[in-house]
Amino acid sequence: MRQRDLKFTFVVGEGKLAFDVVEFELEEALCEPFRLNLKLASDKNAIDFKQVLDQPGTFTLWQDGRPARYVHGIVSHFTQGSSGFRRTRYELLLEPQLARLELCCNWRIFQEKSVPEILQALLKEHRVLDYEQRIYHEHLPREYCVQAGDSDHYLHDRLAFEEGLVYYFRFDEHRHTLVCSDRLYVQERIAGGPVLFSAQPEGDNPQPVLHSFRYSENVRTARQTQRDYSFKRPTYDQEHHLAGEALEHQGSSYERYDYPGRYKRSGAGRPFTESRLRGHRRDARVASVSGDDPRLIPGHAFALEGHPRADFNAWWRPVRVVHRGTQYAGQEEESADAPLGVSYDLRAELVPEDVEWRPAPLPRPRIDGPQIATVVGPAGEEIHCDEWGRVKVQFPWDREGRHDEFSTCWIRVAQNWAGADWGHMAIPRIGQEVIVDYLDGDCDQPIVTGRTYRATNRPPYALPDHKILSTIKSKEYKGSRANELRIDDTTAQISAALMSDHGASALHLGYLTHPRPEGGKPRGEGFELRTDEHGAVRAAKGLLLSTEEQLRAGAGHLDRGVVVQVLEAALELARELGDYAGEHQGVGHDAAPQQTLQEAVRDLGHGANDESGKSNGGKPAIALSGPAGIAAATPASLTLAAGEHVDSVARQNQQVTAGQKVVINAGSDIGLFAQGGELRQITHQGPMLLQAQKNDIRLEAKQSVEVSASQQHVLVTAKEHITLMCGGAYLTLKGGNIELGMPGNFVVKAAKHSHVGAASLEAELPQFEVGETQRRFVLKQLDGQTAMPNVPYTITMANGEVIEGVTDAEGATQLLQKDAMNIAKVDMKHTKSPASAVAGIAAAVGAAVAVGKLLGGPDAEAGRALSEGEISLAKGVFGDSIDYSTVRLRDEDYVPWQGKDYVMAPNGHIYFGEELRGVADWSLESLQRQGLFIHEMTHVWQHQHGVNVLLVGAYQQARQFLLGDQYAYRLEPGKTLKDYNIEQQGDIVRDYFLEKNEFGEASANSRFAGVLKNFPTGY
């Protein structure tokens, strides 16, 4: 339309440089920088480009002498053209400051900032100060957001569109303001009343109108579904799906499913999905118009009037507008054929005002391959990680990072194995170079996939000199020592070693050498387990130490045929000689203990995979076998102790030699029996003493008994009498008298006979004291130090006598008074009655403490409600069998004596001990801690199904105190959940949950289907 009341002007800077506008085209749209192309004229033919380029300028559309529209911006392009009679032509492009962001690109990281915060920082960096944010919804912080080489403008638009933000511009004479908002419906409406529609031909209307209106509807995506994955909640698919609006005129089954959804928190999933759907349906209902009302501005709604179709006379919002205008100079300045006058028209795309229009989402930049980075952390630290083993890194491209713990977010590290509380773990250490890849090529999802050596991190051994060595070598934390697993593949000299610098401890296997880097001097073949510190070898089911040959592991690892044969032969010899001695008045031989030990060695490997068809195994015995002999030597002392018997058998000779003393003590009998040879007891230098301190000594021989003293005398003394007998004759010395009796002759031969008065000679007889035989036993824990007080015990004496009691505060039994030493067996025992008593007391105390709570119920407002994630986690196990709205999580003790790491759930609420408090969402915790949550939710389930968890739990804890673990269970055929106590039920449900999440539902069902067949609807 040509209008004499229209005028276009343009000035640069502070109005010091003005141009005549010949033509202009302004293209502006929601979520796009505007572009104003101007064709200008000036009577100046040598304008300094410095005065124009990159300077602010203002275009004004005047109507009826008043400014109807301003467009303010920055000059991006300036061209000087041809000159006419008095004027020179120029061309110019005016854009917003936002367009300058397209000129800059960067590699950088934003951490823990929301998108509105990132956009604000980005614009401030470019000095876009006329900026207004209108935020009506929550925008969650992004833990990690990377600008991966894309332009600042692309980053701005990508983040804004992902978060459902739209932007447009508002103008005045001196500035243009960028307006950004997450709601479009509440934005500006144009001033000056409704926009008129007129179907009259262009140019026939006395006032600005829209003279063309075309309305269209397009079939577009009807539903948007998205999923994403978070390792913190691996069982939750984070699926969100939304249906579009105004689907009356199209099918509703057109679904777009996108993965990944590019969100890591469920709270961001819905708005992300909503924004994406709105972007796909941005032109589902659209109108195309043309006219000459300059008030149409993208983002500013207007009311339409005058259209013959009533429902089109509604509120509309322009999303794109193209303005064109011409303003030609007078004939005296141009050619005679130059057009005259002013014209202006526009074309626009509209959407209904109530449509929350969004642009199509922009793709994230893809990183096509892995990158190199360096692990970083706090100053003075060597290892810096979180509970997931994640680390922080410094990328070479990051100019803003400071090589510290703030350089990046926590980044996950790929490990060789990663199971539920099992797997491989090697945390990259500060200063190490790592390879960082990106999940789905997403720059915001880095993951460490490998490590590499470099100039500052050299391999453990110099290469290629020691290329035959393979090793896993660690470094002492804040130290210089190491642990190492080394494999040496040197030809004909292969070996392996597991080593620790602490105590120079190592297990060497194969061809043993000194370290290769130090020359590799041979030091043996086979294996060596050594340490400069202490060592121990333990085997709970038995241990075989043998030098019997077994080439290439050709038999079972407990092959003990030779040692069993030797033990059987020794047992047979001991039994034969012992029985013979017993039959000939020797001390009886008890072969049963030796036989028991021999059988234990015989059965040592029973139950193992190569002896599975036999018994379940013998006792945990140690068997030593050396075909060439066993030597034990020490320059100090050697002690051999046995709680029962020591049996020493030699098929030939047993020789005991001591440089000084040989001392043999026995609490009962000592028997020496030589079956076929001599028994000699000789003291070469000192005296020989043979005593029977409380009984008799008998010297008996089938032939002769000889008593002699080579140098001095033989003295025979007795307190009562001495009698010598032979062949019926006798001599008795008694009471100071001598009595001779004989059946035959009495012959006295002497050179002289002397008969004098009475005389006597007294000899001092030895005195024999009774030894101390009373004893008291002390019961101690396995550590040998901690006493066991108040433990019931039973002592069984060798004669069958039984003594019962309870240990005192020091763990001691009562004093046992016996006349002689006895063998005794001590047993600890549990009694049911104390457990029942304590259980009753515990239940009574628990009931007394909580009687008010039992009567009135727990405070329904205390603590916090379950989160959405916690409910979802619990529903995966309990379904809808729990009223989740009544469950409260309380960071407080239920009873004063609740332990710091204990959790109680006695009344439908869960009470956390001090060390377990402060968890915002248990569904985001580790799998094992989620298992704890499921265990406690089982008590909530029990409570809601009628179980008095408080009283039953008190009884159970009493049994736990006295009788041991009440949590351990064994799944048995035919038993369901009701056949187990409440703590076992909690552990069963927890283990079902863990197995389901670790190995899959099929595995969990195969193990727990029987016990949980009525669960969760009942027991």
Swiss-Prot record:
One of the GO biological process terms = protein secretion by the type VI secretion system
PROSITE patterns found in the cross-reference section: ZINC_PROTEASE (PS00142)
Q: What cofactor requirement does the entry state?
A: Zn(2+)
Q: Which InterPro entries match?
A: Gp5/Vgr_OB, T6SS_Rhs_Vgr_dom, T6SS_RhsGE_Vgr_subset, T6SS_Vgr_RhsGE, T6SS_VgrG/RHS, Vgr_OB-fold_dom_sf, VgrG2_DUF2345
Q: Which GO terms describe its molecular function?
A: hydrolase activity; metal ion binding
**Where does the chain bind Zn(2+)?**
H935, H939, E983
Q: Which Pfam families match?
A: DUF2345, Phage_base_V, Phage_GPD, T6SS_Vgr
Phenotype of gene-disrupted mutants: Deletion leads to a 75% loss of internalization of P.aeruginosa into host cell.
Q: What is its EC number?
A: 3.4.24.-
Residues covered by region (Disordered)? 268-291
The stretch of residues making up the signal peptide is none
Catalytic center at which residues? E936
Domain of life where this protein originates:
Bacteria
Chain segments annotated as coiled-coil in the UniProt record: none
Outcome when changing E936A: Abolishes bacterial periplasmic toxicity
Q: Which GO terms describe its cellular component?
A: extracellular region; type VI protein secretion system complex
> Which keywords has UniProt assigned to this entry?
Hydrolase, Metal-binding, Secreted, Zinc
Share what the entry says about its subunit structure, partners included.
Interacts with Tla3; this interaction promotes Tle3 loading onto VgrG2b. Interacts with host gamma-tubulin ring complex components GCP1 and GCP4.
What does the record say about domains? The C-terminal region is part of a wide family of metallopeptidase effectors.
Q: To which protein family does this belong?
A: Belongs to the VgrG protein family.
What is this protein for, i.e. what is its function? Part of the H2 type VI secretion system (H2-T6SS) specialized secretion system, which delivers several virulence factors in both prokaryotic and eukaryotic cells during infection. Forms the spike at the tip of the elongating tube probably formed by haemolysin co-regulated protein 2b/Hcp2b. Allows the delivery of the Tle3 antibacterial toxin to target cells where it exerts its toxicity. Additionally, acts directly as an effector and promotes internalization by interacting with the host gamma-tubulin ring complex.
Protein's name in the database: Type VI secretion system spike protein VgrG2b
Originating species: Pseudomonas aeruginosa (strain ATCC 15692 / DSM 22644 / CIP 104116 / JCM 14847 / LMG 12228 / 1C / PRS 101 / PAO1)
Q: Give the classification, highest ranks.
A: Bacteria, Pseudomonadati, Pseudomonadota, Gammaproteobacteria, Pseudomonadales
